[in-house]
Amino acid sequence: MQVNIDTQAELGLSVTEATTRAQIIGATIATIADHGYARTTFARIKERAGLSSTRLISYHFTNKAGLMQAVLSTVSETKSEYLRERSEGVDPADRPGNLRAYIETSVAFLRDYPQCERVLVEMAAHADDRDGWAMTGVMVGQLRTGALQRQLEQGRKEGAFGDISPEIVALSIAQAVDGVAAAYAADPSVDLDRYGRELADLFARATAR
């Protein structure tokens, strides 16, 4: 995955430092996606990034926790920006419309950023890693259901949705998207657009007044 160098330069780094840092983050994302979180080592990241030494990783991130924080922040920003851009044409006050856009866009994200989705799954499964970033579980949970649950709660208060449990519906949507991700990983020929539409239809009926 190509990481935006500009976001690294904002940390006050030189162009060379920002480029190397972005290169390491991108290589870590690719390594986790290919080998899984547990088998991702500095040695594998070094090889993937084409670095001369693992010491370059330690120089930029100090330890595994710092690297994983940067990786998760990058993936989170990528997904949040993707969802935001793909939902720009929907009226913010149209709660059902925003719910549909969220579901369809979340499914489309699987196709456009498969490595990011794999990283989220892997990091969620290893959130208790002692050497990892302590806030991993909280951040992944927020990305998976936090914003969606707030959207559902607001829609229920406004009368846009029926008498639903926002927490249960948000979790159900997240798990449904996980199911699509698993199906897509097993068979890349699946029609993700159709999956997105049908899931959106399903939850539109489930949340209707």
Predicted features, each with a name:
Residues 24, 28-32, 106, 203:
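Short hydrophobic clusters on alpha-helical segments that form packing/core surfaces
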Residues 61, 122-129:
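Short helix-capping/turn signature of helix-turn-helix
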Residues 70, 84-116, 169-173, 196:
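Hydrophobic alpha-helical connector segments
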